[in-house]
Amino acid sequence: MNFKSTIGLEVHFELKTKSKIFSPSPVTYGAEQNTETNVIDWAMPGTLPMVNKNVYRLGIMVAIATHAHILPTTHFDRKNYFYPDNPKAYQITQFFQPLARDGYIEVEVRGKKKRIGIHEMHIEEDAGKNTHGTNGFSYVDLNRQGVPLLEVVSEPDMEDPEEAYAYLEKLRKIVQFTGASDVKMEEGSMRVDTNISIRPVGQKELGTKVEMKNLNSFDHVRRSLAYEEKRQEQVLLAGGHIQLSTRRFDEATGKTVLERVKEGASDYRYFPEPDIAPDHISQEWIDQIAKELPKSPFDRYDDYVNKFGLKPYDANVLLQTKESSDFFDAAVAAGADPTLAANWMNTQVNGYLNDHRVSLNDIKLTPEHLAEMIKLIKDGTISSKIAKKVFAETIANGTDPKKYVEDNGMVQLSDTSVLAPMVKKVVDDNPQSVEDFKNGKDRAIGFLVGQIMKQTRGKANPKMVNKLLNQELQNR
């Protein structure tokens, strides 16, 4: 018997705001426990939520980028449940009228394109964090309480783990390039819940779904879904039935483990939030946000390959992060040759970031620095070898490349009136190399170039030296 899978994903994005959704408390990853909270986060009696309007703006950006229909009126609702990290005993979310509905993302898997629907996206507040100590006590950190989240709920349109993986990759890149979230799974600013059911091929009725929550990497999503497909198949083939349940993925074993069985859908007794009035989202505001929306990664890719002539691989490396793409764009805007800029970004810059475990925001090299250094290489002022020394100084200390070259006498020697006599003398002093060259040994000229570079302390223009050497040797 063959089975067909049905997969849906719920993805939470932490929105990139300076303060929380309903309170003025700041949002800083890694802050000391309970240092970024106030009486609203604690749910003290008499306190009222104040909506951070920037949350709407960021959510609308994602809705536009995913072709979703933005509702003209949206409001918040209460989702009632009790848990220690939820001091109000309810979560403020959007249930009846979310921010947007009916979007989609197109993915390509195994050479075939497919449209994955987005059922809705809604805004809500995050909960705090529980930590269970070894002393029998549990500790609650409310720094995360009230951090704004955008939940993107897909339609159950995915039919295998690879489609789910492709959808997540595409969605993550879209959200990142809008600037709405930094989508760092390791910091919890992107979290994934999955739902999967299977049914015999030809059966219209969906099977019983199993949920897996808070998967912290795309690889875990793919592996957990693949395992769950096989597990459910084995249960059904053995004559059993699938339980409506929540499971977790065990990274060590690669298996899913039962957490709890559900008797039915949870009843959170949603009702409209009485302390927050409904908000009207005008078409004028939507149009304004659409105009301000950064260029998508897909449009950038077209520019990089078709306009700048970059190789697809180099374009994709630049588009790994919005910061990298923005840096490259700024360097080209400052006059850098696109091909050279991409090469330096993908090799030297990325190498430095990986070696020092820092981001582009942490270094002192600017796009203007990179553009200036590339100009110095192109016009022959410095060699590629010298450029690496200039790069090391600039990225570490922010030194102006041109000034550093001039102050340290690094200007490349290209004057033929100076180089020609040196070339003649080196050829005169090395008759064996001349003989080797005439006998077709290409390494001979490399030796002669090395002698001149040694005499000039690496300042001689290699192209010019090669040209003069070939001319001199041809005349011997």
UniProtKB/Swiss-Prot annotation:
GO terms for molecular function: asparaginyl-tRNA synthase (glutamine-hydrolyzing) activity; ATP binding; glutaminyl-tRNA synthase (glutamine-hydrolyzing) activity. This is Aspartyl/glutamyl-tRNA(Asn/Gln) amidotransferase subunit B. PANTHER family: GLUTAMYL-TRNA GLN AMIDOTRANSFERASE SUBUNIT B MITOCHONDRIAL AND PROKARYOTIC PET112-RELATED (PTHR11659), GLUTAMYL-TRNA(GLN) AMIDOTRANSFERASE SUBUNIT B, MITOCHONDRIAL (PTHR11659:SF0). Signal peptide: none annotated. SUPFAM superfamilies: GatB/YqeY motif, Glutamine synthetase/guanido kinase. It catalyses: L-glutamyl-tRNA(Gln) + L-glutamine + ATP + H2O = L-glutaminyl-tRNA(Gln) + L-glutamate + ADP + phosphate + H(+); L-aspartyl-tRNA(Asn) + L-glutamine + ATP + H2O = L-asparaginyl-tRNA(Asn) + L-glutamate + ADP + phosphate + 2 H(+). It is an enzyme of class 6 (ligase).
